[in-house]
């Protein structure tokens, strides 16, 4: 069976570790997914992409299991990185791991959604019908219904597609910094939901492959 292609958008620590967890997922001792990590085409993004493609985890970590799992994924050839977002066009699954920044205006915390919304717009311009989009970023309540769905719908409509043509789900990042970082992804229960039942079911199948 051909491996499904998963794009992980956002190669911060969470995104890089999640990409690793997905890449080491196996069924019948064979990798389930081909994984492509995507980051911004800027100095920081290019540094992360280059490190990954050279076989180096892009962050310092004392989790030896994460380091070895990353090396294993690189050796087996199903984990790479790029700044070219067009690779999303033939993805089966897209994971959004973009950090939301908080600015303090007049001492009131305000979320900066621009980078997040820009990424969702680009996804809508690129993805094929039936793609599963999982928002893993920790977002405020209502973000999927009030930001993600309308943004995707606007871009899809320009392409003559309906929002019903894609599967939208949310499963917030659940990680524990330290020497068991990877295990905090793969060995703990995960909460998830879908915009439709079909999306929720697809998300459950994916998470069941990644989480022990």
Task: Locate predicted features.
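Structural motif
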Residues: 5, 92-93, 132
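Rossmann-like NAD(P)(H) cofactor-binding subdomain of soluble oxidoreductases
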Residues: 102-174
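Redox-cofactor binding/interface segments in oxidoreductases and associated redox assembly factors
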Residues: 94-96, 135, 193
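Internal alpha-helical scaffold of NAD(P)-dependent oxidoreductase catalytic cores
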Residues: 150-171, 175-212
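Conserved beta-strand segments of alpha/beta enzyme cores
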Residues: 34, 78-80, 167
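Local beta-strand N-terminus motif with an aromatic residue
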Residues: 90-91, 130, 188
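A structured beta-alpha segment of the ubiquitous adenosine-cofactor-binding alpha/beta core
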Residues: 61-93, 99-102, 124
């Amino acid at each position: 069976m051909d491996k499904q292609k998963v794009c992980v958008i956002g190669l911060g620590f969470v995104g890089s570790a999640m990409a690793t967890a997905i890449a080491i997922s196996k069924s019948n001792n064979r990798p389930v997914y081909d994984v492509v990590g995507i980051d911004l085409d800027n100095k920081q993004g290019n540094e992360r992409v280059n490190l990954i493609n050279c076989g180096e985890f892009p962050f310092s970590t004392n989790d030896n299991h994460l380091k070895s799992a990353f090396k294993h994924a690189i050796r087996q050839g199903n984990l790479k990185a790029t700044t070219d977002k067009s690779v999303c066009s033939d993805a089966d699954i897209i994971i959004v791991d973009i950090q939301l920044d908080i600015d303090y205006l007049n001492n009131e915390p305000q979320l900066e959604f621009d980078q997040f919304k820009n990424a969702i717009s680009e996804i809508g311009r690129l993805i094929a019908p039936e793609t599963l989009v999982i928002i893993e970023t920790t977002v405020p309540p209502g973000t999927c219904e009030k930001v993600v769905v309308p943004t995707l719908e606007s871009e899809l409509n320009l392409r003559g597609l309906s929002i019903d043509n894609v599967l939208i789900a949310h499963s917030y990042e659940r990680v524990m910094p330290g020497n068991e970082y990877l295990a905090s992804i793969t060995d703990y229960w995960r909460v998830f939901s879908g915009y439709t039942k079909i999306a929720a079911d697809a998300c459950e199948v994916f998470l069941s492959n990644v989480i022990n």
